[in-house]
Amino acid sequence: MGLWDALLNWLRSLFFKQEMELSLIGLQNAGKTSLVNVVATGGYSEDMIPTVGFNMRKVTKGSVTIKLWDLGGQPRFRSMWERYCRSVSAIVYVVDAADPDNLSVSKSELHDLLSKTSLNGIPLLVLGNKIDKPGALSKEALTDEMGLKSLTDREVCCFMISCKNSTNIDQVIDWLVKHSKSSN
């Protein structure tokens, strides 16, 4: 049966290609560009240059092509977030789980963005990054601090990840493929 399933999956991949478009947003130094690099190449670098404006990268995983918009997190770029989040398959909000000092700003920026009617119903994936660092929040603490339970107009999920160690990156990709707006 395994050979038959493999053959069917191969045939499906030839005829049923899926495309997704994602916006990666979050405050500066949360790890958005590192996430793009880990998803695209499996590689991680300690030396990241802050994103100025945005970068776009296409990545293919199996039969799914993912277009990733990596948006700058500095205050001067946050006004662009809404524009790049309209009509995407999902919004990926990256939070530095080891930086409690920025959580209130991060929560405020996320909730302000999601209050825009143009973004109603777009699935949200919140990623607590840098769980490899001491003092990183738990999933429950991050969910509470970010007020995620109050977001009821869309599908919301939270994963704790480490781009540095590639922790939970495969689960993130699986969730995105299964729950993105385009696959509903």
UniProtKB/Swiss-Prot annotation:
Positions with a binding annotation for GTP: 29-34, 48-51, 70-74, 129-132
Family statement: Belongs to the small GTPase superfamily. Arf family.
Keyword GTP-binding in record: yes
Top-level division of the source organism's lineage: Eukaryota
A molecular function GO annotation: GTP binding
CDD domains tied to this protein: Arl10_like (cd04159)
Name of the protein described by the UniProt record: ADP-ribosylation factor-like protein 8b
Protein's GO biological process: cell division; chromosome segregation; protein transport
Gene name of the record: ARL8B
GO cellular component: late endosome membrane; lysosomal membrane; plant-type vacuole; plasmodesma; spindle
Keyword Membrane assigned: yes
Pfam families, alphabetized: Arf
Intramembrane region residues: 1-18
Keywords: Cell cycle, Cell division, Chromosome partition, Cytoplasm, Cytoskeleton, Endosome, GTP-binding, Lysosome, Membrane, Mitosis, Nucleotide-binding
